């Protein structure tokens, strides 16, 4: 189980139980839309479904209840809320297994990659704005909902992209020659 998985083989241990890539993408999606409906994406064991297939028995996450997203709904949100809402829960609850999940370096890289991919495709500004404008065109002309959602997403997109580490550093104890670490071994 995920409860018993730990140590250097953590990823291998859970990969047979859960679809790690799907979970990473699900968490990235829910983080981007900033779901404030209590669910696994924000560290609460509520309002989500699990799916286990026959051919692929790894557990997949299925979202539902989207009435508190993009800064809308009955729960205050800020576009600059954490990109790790599953472990920095706004309601003060935590699920220890998610701390371990996001602490794995391979999963963390996948999560960052999924955030960037979704923000540069599905949530890319022109695509997202058109989707919102076309989907909410039934609202009264004096409604600010479309503008509010678009504005929120602009802020959220910028904030998330700014949180994803982009620098790559390497350190070494090799001897230096002409400013580069070198070895003959």
Regions found by a protein language model. Give the residues of each.
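Catalytic-core segments of enzymes that bind and process phosphorylated/nucleotide-bearing substrates
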Residues: 1-184
């Amino acid at each position: 189980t995920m409860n018993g998985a730990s140590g250097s083989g953590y990823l291998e241990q859970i990969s047979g139980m859960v679809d790690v890539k799907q979970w990473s993408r699900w968490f990235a999606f829910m983080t981007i839309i900033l779901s404030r409906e209590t669910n696994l994406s924000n560290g609460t064991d509520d309002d989500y479904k699990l799916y286990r297939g026959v051919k692929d028995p790894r557990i997949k996450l299925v979202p539902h209840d989207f009435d508190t997203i993009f800064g809308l709904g009955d729960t205050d949100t800020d576009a600059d809320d954490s990109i790790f809402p599953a472990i920095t829960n706004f309601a003060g609850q935590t699920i220890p297994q998610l701390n371990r999940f996001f602490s794995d370096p391979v999963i963390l890289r996948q999560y960052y990659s999924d955030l960037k991919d979704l923000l540069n495709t599905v949530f890319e500004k022109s695509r997202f704005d058109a989707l919102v404008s076309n989907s909410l065109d039934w609202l009264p002309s004096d409604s600010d909902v479309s503008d509010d959602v678009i504005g929120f997403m602009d802020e959220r997109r910028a904030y998330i992209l700014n949180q994803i580490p982009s620098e790559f550093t390497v350190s070494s104890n090799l001897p230096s020659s002409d400013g580069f670490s070198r070895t003959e071994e």
